[in-house]
A protein has these predicted regions:
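Mid-domain Rossmann-like dinucleotide-binding core that forms the NAD(H)/NADP(H) cofactor-binding site
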Residues: 134-216, 220
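Glycine-rich beta-strand-centered segment in the early N-terminal region that forms part
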Residues: 21-35, 48-94, 133-136
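Glycine-rich cofactor phosphate-binding loops and adjacent beta1-alpha1 units
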Residues: 158, 201, 206-281
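NAD(P)H dinucleotide-binding glycine-rich loop of Rossmann-like/cofactor-binding domains
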Residues: 90-169
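Residues in the short beta-alpha loop(s) of Rossmann-like NAD(P)-binding domains
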Residues: 196, 263, 288
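C-terminal hydrophobic helical "lid"/dimerization subdomain
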Residues: 245-249, 290-342
Length: 342
């Protein structure tokens, strides 16, 4: 089968012909109909986050149909529409038993430590599949598995209450989902912070209040818009320490900042003025949980989460096209999500 693979860090991905995956007794072979291209894959290609062993087929946002099932995989049948939960876990350790499988002691990840979705087929454990409703296109089902689910988990971690205000720093693939989901969680006002006017216009379409960080100090603008109070929840989705600091500085008394973006650099804050003095919190978040996916999919099925505008491009299973999409993400272009349609 065809697969676009990372063969060496800091080098373009390569199209290769590789053997079809072999499924185990509890596995399912999925025929990939759509695979999202995530900013995390930019980090993998650049060598900022380890991927091993190489070569590796990237891609952790996957939707498709069941092609074949293992002997003991009885939940799904051939041609069922499915999405793939990319966090591989043992199901028996302390973290799995407490519903925090992203910290599984034997944990792994599809598209990083196991071959992923930049291919025609992928083999996954049956327990990592969720049914994809007929109302949701494969392209949207794919990006629900990372960009939307990560946003959903971050909002849950924020403990957002009805009537509170939220600022989303970065309205790309994750942020445009976070804007919509925040209203589903009961937010009164959602402020969308970005430097890209196109992304801000899209966020405004979903009832966000735009804050252009290119032309204004976003912290001062949020303070002004909230009559000096600040926001109850700020979610940082870029991965720049400067933006993380702005998220913390924009908080109201007893506000919570959730850090989603990945950075290799430290975050420096005024500990008393920005944290202790107003009993603010900084919350880290990591991936998402399998138990969160059914509600997320139902919100999408009901039209509470609209993703058609979030998919700015589709590309074939072609190395040049995929590398170009990764380049665009690396350069923070206007693209929100590019999806591979094999």
């Amino acid at each position: 089968m065809k697969a676009v693979r990372l063969t060496e860090v800091q080098h373009p991905l390569q199209l290769q012909n590789i053997p079809m995956p072999i499924i185990g007794e509890n596995d399912v072979l999925v025929s990939i109909k759509a695979a999202g291209i995530c900013h995390t894959d930019v980090h993998y290609r650049a060598g900022k986050s380890p991927v091993h062993p190489l070569p590796r087929t990237l891609g952790h946002e996957i939707a498709g149909t069941v092609e074949q099932v293992g002997k003991h995989a009885t939940t799904y049948k051939v041609d069922d529409r499915v999405c793939v939960h990319y966090v591989l876990s043992c199901g028996t350790c302390y973290f799995c038993n407490t519903g925090n499988e992203q910290f599984c002691v034997q944990g792994s990840m599809i598209g990083r430590y196991a071959d992923g979705g930049y291919a025609e087929y992928v083999s996954v454990p049956q327990r990592n599949l969720v049914s994809l409703p007929d109302e949701i296109p494969f392209e949207q089902g794919a990006i629900l598995m990372c960009s939307s689910s990560t946003a959903f988990h971050a909002l849950r971690k924020s403990r957002l209450q009805g009537g509170e205000t939220v600022a989303i720093f970065g309205v790309g693939g994750l942020g445009i989902s976070a804007v919509q989901l925040a209203y589903s969680f009961g937010a009164l006002d959602v402020y969308a912070v970005d430097i890209n006017a196109d992304k801000l216009r899209l966020a405004e379409k979903y009832s966000a209040i735009p804050v252009n960080a290119m032309s204004n100090d976003p912290v001062a603008e949020i303070r002004s818009l909230t009559h000096g109070k600040g926001v109850d929840v700020a979610i940082e989705m870029i991965g720049f320490p400067q933006v993380m600091k702005q998220a913390v500085q924009s908080l109201a008394v007893m506000g919570r900042a959730v850090i989603v973006g990945i950075s290799e650099r430290p975050l420096e804050i005024d500990t008393y003025r920005e944290l202790l003095g107003k009993e603010a919190e900084i919350i880290g978040t990591n991936d998402h949980l399998l138990q969160e996916l059914p509600l997320l999919l139902e919100l999408a099925r009901r039209g509470k989460l609209k993703l058609s505008d979030a998919i700015t491009h589709t590309v074939p299973l072609d190395a040049d096209a995929i590398n170009q999409a990764l380049d665009n993400l690396e350069n923070f272009s206007s693209d929100i999500r590019t999806v591979i349609v094999p």
